[in-house]
Amino acid sequence: MSATKMNAQEIIKFIADAKKKTPVKVTFDGELHGSIPWSVVKLGNVLFGDWEEIKPLLANLEENKTYVVEQDARNSAVPLLDKRDINARIEPGAIIRDQVEIGDNAVIMMGAVINIGAEIGAGTMIDMGAILGGRAIVGKNSHVGAGAVLAGVIEPASAEPVRVGDNVLIGANAVVIEGVQIGSGSVVAAGAIVTQDVPENVVVAGVPARVIKTIDEKTQQKTALEDALRTL
C-alpha cells in the first residue's frame, strides 16, 4: 500500500511553523477608526479575521462600543480544508482539516472528523461520526462505518499510519489501531478492534479481531456498495 504524501515530520513542521490564529467573526455597533489590516475582512458592521488583529480595532470603536464575538478555535495551527473545489459530496457538520486529500465522488457524512494528512480514495464513503486520524489512508470504493475509528499517528513520528485498501468495508464502531493495514476486498465487522494486519478478501471480527472466513459470494452481496449514493 502507498505511503502517505505527508510524513510525520513534514506534518509536525507544518504545525510548528504555522502562524497560530484565533479566527473570529465580530459584529459591532458604532464607528471604527484606524486602518484595517489587509488580513481582516470588513463587510458592513462585521469583521472576519484573527482576534489579535481585530482586538485593537475594537478598542477604537466609538459611540456605544457594543460588539459580539463568535469563535470556535484558539491559537489554531491548522485551518479547516477549503472544500469549494473538491469533487466529492461533503455533508454539513463534517470536520476536515487542511492537508487532507479527498478523491472524486467520495462521500463524507455528517459528524465525520478527518485529521491532517489523511487520504480518502475515489468513491469511498466516510459515514456519520467516523474518525480518521492523522495520515490515515483509505483506498478507493471503500466504506468506513458510522463511529468507526482509524487511529492517527503524528506523534511519535516513527509510528506507521493506518492503511486501508480498496473495496474494504469497515463496520460501525470498529477500531483500527495505529500501523495496521487492511487488505483490499476485506470486511471488518462492526465493533471489532483490529490490532494486527488483515490480509485481502477476508472477514475479521471480535476483540481483538481475527479472521473468521474468506469472502464469498454471499458476503459480497451483503456488503455491496451503492453507486447511486456517490453520484454528484
From Swiss-Prot:
GO terms for biological process: diaminopimelate biosynthetic process; lysine biosynthetic process via diaminopimelate. Belongs to the transferase hexapeptide repeat family. DapH subfamily. InterPro entries: DapH, DapH_N, Hexapep, Hexapep_transf_CS, Trans_hexapeptide_repeat, Trimer_LpxA-like_sf. The keyword Manganese does not apply. This is 2,3,4,5-tetrahydropyridine-2,6-dicarboxylate N-acetyltransferase. Gene3D superfamilies: Hexapeptide repeat proteins, Malonyl-CoA ACP transacylase, ACP-binding. SUPFAM superfamilies: Trimeric LpxA-like enzymes. It catalyses: (S)-2,3,4,5-tetrahydrodipicolinate + acetyl-CoA + H2O = L-2-acetamido-6-oxoheptanedioate + CoA. Keywords: Acyltransferase, Amino-acid biosynthesis, Diaminopimelate biosynthesis, Lysine biosynthesis, Repeat, Transferase. Pathway: Amino-acid biosynthesis; L-lysine biosynthesis via DAP pathway; LL-2,6-diaminopimelate from (S)-tetrahydrodipicolinate (acetylase route): step 1/3. Pfam families: DapH_N, Hexapep, Hexapep_2. The keyword Repeat applies. Catalyzes the transfer of an acetyl group from acetyl-CoA to tetrahydrodipicolinate. It comes from Streptococcus sanguinis (strain SK36). One of its GO terms (molecular function) is tetrahydrodipicolinate N-acetyltransferase activity. The lineage of its organism: Bacteria, Bacillati, Bacillota, Bacilli, Lactobacillales. Its EC number is 2.3.1.89. It comes from the Bacteria.
